[in-house]
């Protein structure tokens, strides 16, 4: 399974460093949940050309069109201070004197509330990760296997954030919730692998990892499949439910990262621990 643990560890570490560089230099786009602002959603029955609206709101607001089974949706996002200008441009585009004549909805989040949510959201992620790390250490009571699990889980989160930066997925209330879910999803296969390896020392390392991989990959791929189905359904039938789409996307990215980190990084560290570190102690 793992011929050279150094190569096995190096691949996910390289991806981890790349993710950190992406986050540091490119950043992660933030939704109005984080930055504060107004989102106006207008339902229309025909496929309209929104290029004139985009041009009139260039530099003021973000405009996009979504298609679903029951029609089309035009979504406009802007800063709270620009909302009056944006509404005026919308009225001019649709040739109406009031937005009440349109099938529209409006969501506004203040800057203070959004910054507070951002702060509390990441506190929740931090505390969840810390308590997970404590539980893992108390269970295994060994710094090397415990550290491997914690490093793998941390790498899952950072790689997911790096993928969000690369793909332009916004950091929002939904994606922060997804990151919280990632902590739970990411450690199960790591704990499965570590428990199997440490409790079956009479078997060869590669044989034990292969057995654990069958169960672990089945669990992970089942979840990825479920999230893919959710993502496809949302994109095709309810595109305005972008919260569900964002959660599904982040979980898929994180679970792909988890496959790499569990079966290369964690397994590589465990092979070093069993074949070299532990052997020297004995």
From Swiss-Prot:
A Pfam family cross-referenced in the UniProt record is: SecD_SecF_C
Task: Show the stretches that span the lipid bilayer.
Answer: 9-29, 120-140, 149-169, 174-194, 214-234, 236-256
Any one of the GO CC terms: plasma membrane
Q: Does the keyword Cell membrane apply?
A: yes
SUPFAM superfamilies per UniProt: Multidrug efflux transporter AcrB transmembrane domain
In the bilayer, the protein is annotated as: Multi-pass membrane protein
Give the record's keywords alphabetically.
Answer: Cell membrane, Membrane, Protein transport, Translocation, Transmembrane, Transmembrane helix, Transport
Enumerate the Gene Ontology biological process terms.
intracellular protein transmembrane transport; protein targeting; protein transport
The keyword Kinase belongs to this UniProt entry's keyword annotation: no
Q: Which compartments is it annotated to reside in?
A: Cell membrane
> Could you tell me which InterPro entries the record lists for this protein?
SecD/SecF_arch_bac, SecD/SecF_CS, SecD_SecF_C, SecF_arc
Purpose: Involved in protein export.
Question: Which family is it part of?
Answer: Belongs to the SecD/SecF family. SecF subfamily.
Q: Which NCBIfam families match?
A: PRK08578.1-1, PRK08578.2-1
PANTHER family per record:
PROTEIN TRANSLOCASE SUBUNIT SECF, PROTEIN-EXPORT MEMBRANE PROTEIN SEC
Provide the assembly information: Part of the protein translocation apparatus. Forms a complex with SecD.
Supply the name of the protein: Protein-export membrane protein SecF
State the species of origin.
Methanocaldococcus jannaschii (strain ATCC 43067 / DSM 2661 / JAL-1 / JCM 10045 / NBRC 100440) (Methanococcus jannaschii)
């Amino acid at each position: 399974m793992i011929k050279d643990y150094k190569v096995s560890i190096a691949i996910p570490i390289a991806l981890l460093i790349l993710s950190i560089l992406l986050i540091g230099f490119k950043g992660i786009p933030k939704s109005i949940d984080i930055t504060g602002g107004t989102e106006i959603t207008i339902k229309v029955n025909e496929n309209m050309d929104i290029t004139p609206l985009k041009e009139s709101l260039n530099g003021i607001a973000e405009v996009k069109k979504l298609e679903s089974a029951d029609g089309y949706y035009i979504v406009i996002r802007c800063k709270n201070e620009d909302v009056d200008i944006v509404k005026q441009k919308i009225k001019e585009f649709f040739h109406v004197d009031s937005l009440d004549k349109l099938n529209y909805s409006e969501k506004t989040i203040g800057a203070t509330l959004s910054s507070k949510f951002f702060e509390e959201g990441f506190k929740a992620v931090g505390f969840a990760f810390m308590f997970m790390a404590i539980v893992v250490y108390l269970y295994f009571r060994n710094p090397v296997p415990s550290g491997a699990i914690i490093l793998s889980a941390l790498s899952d989160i950072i790689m997911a954030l790096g993928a969000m930066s690369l793909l332009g997925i916004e950091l929002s209330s939904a994606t922060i919730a997804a990151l919280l879910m990632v902590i739970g999803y990411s450690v199960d296969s790591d704990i499965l692998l570590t428990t199997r390896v440490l409790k079956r020392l009479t078997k060869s390392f590669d044989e034990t990892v292969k057995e654990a991989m069958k169960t672990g990959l089945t669990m992970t791929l089942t979840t990825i499949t479920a999230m893919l189905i959710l993502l496809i359904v949302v994109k095709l039938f309810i595109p305005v439910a972008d919260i569900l789409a964002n959660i599904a996307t982040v979980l898929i990215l994180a679970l792909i990262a988890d496959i790499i980190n569990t079966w290369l990084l964690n397994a590589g560290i465990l092979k070093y621990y069993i074949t070299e570190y532990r052997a020297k102690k004995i």
